[in-house]
Amino acid sequence: MEKMVMKMLVIFVFGMNHWTCTGFPVYDYDPASLKEALSASVAKVNSQSLSPYLFRAFRSSIKRVNALDEDSLTMDLEFRIQETTCRRESEADPATCDFQRGYHVPVAVCRSTVRMSAERVQDVWVRCHWSSSSGSSSSEEMFFGDILGSSTSRNSHLLGLTPDRSRGEPLYERSREMRRNFPLGNRRYSNPWPRARVNPGFE
């Protein structure tokens, strides 16, 4: 009987060590921190958006939590955003704004990494790409430069997204497809990419 108890204790201790070494989530973070991290991610998008409207997140999920020390961590989040009816100058909380409605209102899929210390946001990095009916792919992925443009000007500016230069050719083909689906209303902006400005300090 004693041998059986000792054997069970050894298995239990070994199993706990194994989970810790393989990244078993042992950090007990406050759910309020997750909400703050998501709000900071959306705020980062809205702060650099070209759109006159605020974006709001939905279908959010946490992908990973990395404990840096006993008081700091990073969170990897995935969420979707869509324009709301609230204008930027209103300074409203996007979470309280209604989504815009209509067939041509796009949805972007975003991933963010948020570094927190003492339960406060320190740094935020965000990367998004527009969703499509066929699903996302590497050729559709775009990185934030001047970020998201308004849905009212999406025809001429491809929503303000700046392409990843390493995938320039696939993105050019994608832009031609989007222009076929959403014909340009103003031919003066038929080639928006040379006008795009890249913000090197933001990913």
From Swiss-Prot:
The keyword Transmembrane does not apply. Disulfide bonds join C86-C97, C110-C128. It holds the Pfam family Spp-24. It is found in: Secreted. Multiply phosphorylated at serine residues. Phosphorylation sites are present in the extracellular medium. Residues 1-23 form the signal peptide. This is Secreted phosphoprotein 24.
